[in-house]
């Protein structure tokens, strides 16, 4: 299965490059908007294929996301008193798995689970 997923991922990456070329040639903002939506969907497909290849598929899934602050405490529970398990940097790709109040449950691509305050992550469209 991994071989097929890898092949699909390469096809999607090639498609993204072609859509980027098309984006440079569009004439209207509506056309640009439509191409941007396709590119966002392709990015989601590529991230999904990476996740499937990793073997670390979470039991729950809300969205793919990105850490948007420089040093974000990754805790073992949704509380400021939860044990610190790691510090995440800006741009770290994550998987949003659940929400509890002001906290978001995450899974890292290496399979680690934890929690961060919701203001420090952005869900990808």
Q: Can you name each region flagged by the protein language model?
A:
Residues 1-26:
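Alpha-helical bundle segments that constitute or directly flank the non-heme di-iron/ferroxidase center
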Residues 79-82:
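Short, solvent-exposed loop/turn positions at domain surfaces
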Residues 1-5, 29-44:
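Alpha-helical scaffold segments that form or flank carboxylate-/histidine-based iron centers
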Residues 11-19, 35-49:
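Alpha-helical transition-metal enzyme core signature, strongest for iron centers
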Residues 24, 31, 50-57, 61:
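Alpha-helical coiled-coil oligomerization motifs
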Residues 54-76, 86-90, 97-100, 118-125:
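SH3-family beta-barrel domains
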Residues 91, 104-108, 116:
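SH3/SH3-like beta-barrel fold
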